[in-house]
A protein has these predicted regions:
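Rossmann-fold dinucleotide-binding core
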Residues: 129-209
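NAD(P)-dependent dehydrogenase/reductase Rossmann-like domain
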Residues: 300, 304-332
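Rossmann-fold NAD(P) dinucleotide-binding segment
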Residues: 84-148
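NAD(P)+-binding Rossmann beta1-loop-alpha1 motif at the extreme N-terminus of oxidoreductases
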Residues: 25-97, 122, 190
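Interdomain hinge/lid region at the active-site interface
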Residues: 202, 211, 246-310
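Short, positively charged and aromatic/hydrophobic N-terminal segments
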Residues: 4, 13, 17-28
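Active-site-proximal catalytic alpha-helix in oxidoreductases
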Residues: 163-164, 168-171, 192, 198-229, ...
Length: 332
């Protein structure tokens, strides 16, 4: 069973069942509007989250390794912090929006990490894509410090994060949800409550990443075949996006290829990592994932060819014998 929470409201009572899924009916808790919330990591997703929380009335403290980004956020009404520890000293809830388990470890437990500065009973909402086993272990470690943890990976891209409309896949104890509700409502459009055990949110996220990675790889392969066969790339995109072969990733990523714009919104190396987590999880259960393994190899090949920091659509560059679209010159 899971519970879907609606955005911009805090959870109250249960009001109905939809297809066997219990749906929480939520009401705005205006007393939470002045709560201090910290956001660690102002990348494509983190900056959108911080801005959404600011619009929702929270006092948002933020830190990032890039001081220019935090200064920009401060000019918009946020509070720039020099380190996770400085941020934690001022906040009751921290949202970590970093890339992986290693960065999560650093911002929480490293030099000037948040954990040592947090008051007992504070909440950490972890949004990184990590191994489910890491999420379980992290929950136990934070509990030993008297802290609450919500395993809460995210999806939807930078645009949905900026609009406060992203999807969150969450799991954790009731006390964590009680502390998190207003913050979740301020930063997400859909919050799926998957259980009271840490790691369930991360399991669902890596399954999502399995599909996302395979879809991007398949989209690149389809476009590469079209180019090889002399099909006009723009025409191919138009037809597929109005046909049964379309996917969200095809529709979203192929325009990057058509514009020859590989500015990373999500990089090739992200899928090297995420599909690696998928395969590690399946390997521990001795479960075969042939499509995931092939897609992972494609992203690995793109990364080893020097495209790791480019947009994940750059996986198309591994295909030989094709001429990719070039950047179009602006009209005079």
């Amino acid at each position: 069973m899971f519970v879907k929470l609606k955005k911009h409201f805090t959870r109250s009572d249960h009001r109905g069942m939809i297809g066997g899924i219990r749906l929480h009916t939520l009401t705005r808790n205006t007393s939470m509007n002045n709560k201090n919330v910290g956001v660690v990591g102002l990348g494509a997703m983190g900056l959108g989250i911080a801005r959404s929380l600011l619009r929702s009335g929270f006092n948002v403290h933020a830190c990032d390794v890039r001081s220019a980004v935090t200064e920009q956020f401060a000019s918009e009404g946020g509070v720039a912090c020099a380190s996770p520890a400085t941020l934690a000293a001022a906040c009751d809830v921290i949202v970590t929006v970093v890339v992986n388990a290693e960065q999560t470890e650093t911002v929480l437990f490293g030099d000037n990490g948040a954990v040592a500065a947090l008051r007992p009973g504070s909440l950490i909402i972890g949004c990184a894509t990590v191994a489910p086993t890491f999420a379980v272990d992290l929950g136990e470690r934070l509990a030993s410090h008297g802290l609450l943890y919500l395993d809460a990976p995210i999806s939807g891209g930078a645009a949905k994060a900026a609009a406060g409309e992203m999807t969150m896949m969450t799991s954790g104890p009731q006390a964590a949800y009680a502390a998190a509700d207003a913050v979740l409502a301020g930063m997400a459009g859909k919050v799926y409550r998957l259980g009271d055990v840490h790691g369930l949110g991360s399991k669902v996220k890596i399954i999502n990443q399995l599909l996302a990675g395979v879809h991007i790889a398949a989209s690149a392969e389809a476009m590469a075949l079209g180019l090889r066969e002399g099909v006009d790339a723009d025409a191919l995109y138009e037809v597929i996006t109005h046909s049964a072969g379309n996917s969200w990733m095809f529709e979203n990523r192929v325009p990057h290829i058509l514009k020859a714009d590989y500015t990373p919104l999500s990089a090739v190396d992200i899928f090297v990592k995420d599909l690696g987590l998928v395969l590690d999880t399946a390997r521990a259960s001795k479960f075969p994932l042939p499509l995931s393994a092939t897609a992972h190899q494609m992203f690995m090949q793109a990364s080893s060819a020097g495209f790791g920091r480019e947009d994940d659509s750059a996986v198309i560059k591994i295909f030989p014998g094709i001429e990719l679209p070039t950047a179009k010159k602006p009209s005079a």
